[in-house]
Amino acid sequence: MQMIDRRGFLVTAALAGLGVAAGGLRASAADTRLRCVWWGSADRSKRTNDVIALYQKANPQTEVSGEMIAGSDYWTKLATSMAGRNVADIFQLEPSTIADYSGRGACMELDQFVGKSLDLSTFGKSEVDLCRIDGKLYGVGLGLNSFCMMYDADTLKGAGVTVPKEQITWKALAELARDFKKNGPAKRNYWAVPYGARYHYVFDVWLRQRGKLLFQDGTIGFNKEDAKEWFAYWEDLRENKLCVSADIQTRDDNTIESNALTLGNSAIGFAYSNQLVGYQKLNKQTLSIGMLPGEGPGKPTGHYYRPGLIWSISSTSTNGEEAAKFINFFVNDLEAGKVLGVERGVPPAKVVREALLPTLNETERKTVDYIESLSGKLDSYPEPAPIGANEFDRGVMRPIADSLAFGRASVDEAAQNLVDTGSRTLRKRG
């Protein structure tokens, strides 16, 4: 993957391709109706609905019904609609779920529409292939992102601590949390850092820094000792009251609104880089962005570029061609690109990136600069996640970490449970 010059805006790197549906006969042009669902913040919902309005204005023969589903309910409703063969024509996925849901038969294969309803001419092959599973294209990457740490630099500075420009180490983060407790604001239920044991994507980065993987060959890529070391790090912070308490941390449902940073309980939050736009809208303090902690200079950072979010088309849709046209508009139209900004990540289409550059505000520019700063510091993109990866996050890792945080399990028990239950939950595709 190669970065283009800064005036050219950003990478030719790592984004996923655009998708077009393969299903069924197209409905009459006079009465084509599409359903489109996603999760995310109110800001994302407004941007998406504004693009839907633009599309309908340009295509009055098509009606697009958009719906934002709260993150806590999205996957439950998607599973229910899959069981009833009533999945929306266009639905949002992410890297850890596209492999899972395509393996369950929920996603249409999109290759047959490339170069027809779907223009991929500004995408490199490596960009398209990020949403290719077992050689078949199942989704459309909507923006480039990576993992990150967002933080209130002014509040940290007021406590006499700072986050270095380069990647902070895990040891230094623990020391920062200790110093913040001593010198930070006298504010009830306020810490420097979250209780990060429950974040599967942070665990993913931590494992990569040690030469391990979260998933490998259709199952877990780590062992009990890895899990013990991970859980022990966070338990040491929690037991010394240096991180967000269990009763508050367990409210986090991996949404911007429920993160301890947004709730005013921590000065630092773990997230994905494109989410800076949404976090800043809900935080009065100016937020900074940097890498998740690491092991120090010269060591693997554990980060990689990823398609932040993905549009897929339901395998049961009877309006596949029109759904493909909508996705094509979503990622290639200049006006749509200006509305969407970088809220879902840095746009994959070069022409959209270049048109967007002069319009970015300070927060959006931080997102782009962060993605650019990662060039030359990244790991390779992982193999497709196994079937059950979404359940591993929501139904395995979070509950086990929460049980540990509430003192209902020891580090050893939690680690063994993560290995055993994780192994049972995952299965290889095909």
Positions of PLM-derived features:
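Hinge/lid segment of periplasmic solute-binding proteins
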Residues: 95-148, 288-290, 360, 365, ...
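Extracytoplasmic "Venus flytrap"/periplasmic binding protein-like
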Residues: 50, 54-123, 157-160, 258-268, ...
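C-terminal capping/gating helix-and-loop segments adjacent to ligand/active sites or protein-protein/ligand interfaces
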Residues: 368-421
